[in-house]
């Protein structure tokens, strides 16, 4: 005849049967958590570039977009702006932010309208040099054409939109040029014109010669002709001979009004 358990013994027996599966079920979950944690990528500090062993970019410019509504033509495109090089001395140059100088294709198109308005302008540097190339690039905007050009990185770094980087870095900015989706641009060397800081909405189409001539008369007369200029400093190279480092591209959206014959646009 089976021994009859007391109420206390029965409760203990039931508890023992429940603990074992619970303990066993926790172990696989713990192992899964450890495996999941091992698969997580290690965090990196944003904005820090490490020299790659080998790196390259295929530049494919997006097709220009042109649309007209209500007498206003809107043009969106990306172009090569200028080639850049570096020496062991600081070299500071500037690019006038206006249709005549932003890109050769835009120059030919915008010359058929009397006035323009900048909706967005972005300059992006893409390297074309080995990762062993020494040098740095610095960029920023000036919004008053009467101001003198900076002569040092310290002065340039105070400009609106200032950005800098090593000449071999910046390839992650390619998405700004070809119009693809940008996933990680922490190391992109790119700067955007603050169109909200411009002196006026509409500017007359002028050439760089027109601007230079006006400056020769009075710099204050020349100021209303150009929205802004991009200041570029190249320095920290290892040789007194200029070494090619990369190219500067410009992406823009611009409004054009008052169409005119090219021969009449002065």
From Swiss-Prot:
Residues 72-257 are annotated as: S domain, virion shell. Disulfide bonds join 175-182. GO terms for cellular component: T=3 icosahedral viral capsid. Residues 13-51 are annotated as: Disordered. InterPro entries: Capsid_prot_S-dom_vir, Viral_coat. Belongs to the icosahedral plant coat protein family. Capsid protein self-assembles to form an icosahedral capsid with a T=3 symmetry, about 30 nm in diameter, and consisting of 180 capsid proteins. Each icosahedral unit contains three protein subunits (Potential). This is Capsid protein. It comes from Southern bean mosaic virus (isolate Bean/United States/Arkansas).
